[in-house]
């Protein structure tokens, strides 16, 4: 493992990957959601989102294009950042995933071996004989 890789012991230690950009619909939704919520305070969130979805579908193509263009710009930035992340940390991530997979296999193997051993010991140990009741009756009392 390289010197850079040695500072990352687990996948959680790696810097987080860039987040994917929001689609045109989600950009639109984030712009109008608060307004729709105040217009219809009795509606539940899924109902509001459903209405926003219908609105977005009904938007003229020219207006939709504005949101799609914003998405494409964010996507280009994301792709660039993601490529840089993969170039810098991709091999380290793969190595750490492989290590985690091997560790899990080993743990599973040990667990199964312990399970088999337990089954063997149960079969070898004789079952405890049930306690016998004393058939003798209590002696009769003398008068």
From Swiss-Prot:
SUPFAM superfamilies for the chain: HMG-box
Coiled coil: none
Signal sequence annotation: none
Pfam families named among the record's database cross-references: HMG_box (PF00505)
Keyword field: Chromosome, DNA-binding, Nucleus
CDD domains according to UniProt: HMG-box_SF
Annotated stretches, region: Disordered: 1-22, 100-143
Basic and acidic residues bias (residue ranges): 100-120, 131-143
Molecular functions (GO terms): DNA binding
Chain positions found as Blocked amino end (Ala): 70
InterPro entries cross-referenced by the UniProt entry: HMG_box_dom (IPR009071), HMG_box_dom_sf (IPR036910), HMGB (IPR050342)
Domain of life: Eukaryota
Name by which UniProt lists this protein: High mobility group protein B
Subcellular location: Nucleus; Chromosome
DNA-binding region in chain numbering: 18-86
A cellular component annotation (GO) from this entry: nucleus
């Amino acid at each position: 493992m390289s010197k850079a890789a040695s500072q990352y012991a687990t996948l959680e230690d790696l810097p987080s990957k860039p987040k994917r950009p929001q689609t045109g619909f989600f950009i639109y939704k984030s712009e109008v959601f608060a307004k729709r919520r105040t217009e219809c305070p009795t509606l539940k969130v899924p109902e509001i989102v459903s209405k926003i979805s219908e609105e977005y579908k009904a938007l003229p193509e020219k207006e939709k294009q504005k949101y799609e263009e914003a998405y494409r710009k964010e996507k280009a930035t994301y792709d660039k950042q993601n490529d840089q992340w993969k170039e810098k940390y991709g091999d380290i991530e793969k190595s750490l995933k492989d290590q985690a997979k091997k560790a899990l296999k080993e743990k599973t193997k040990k667990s199964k071996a312990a399970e088999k051993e337990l089954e063997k010991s149960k079969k070898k140990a004789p079952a405890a004989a049930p306690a016998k009741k004393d058939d003798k009756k209590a002696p009769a009392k003398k008068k």
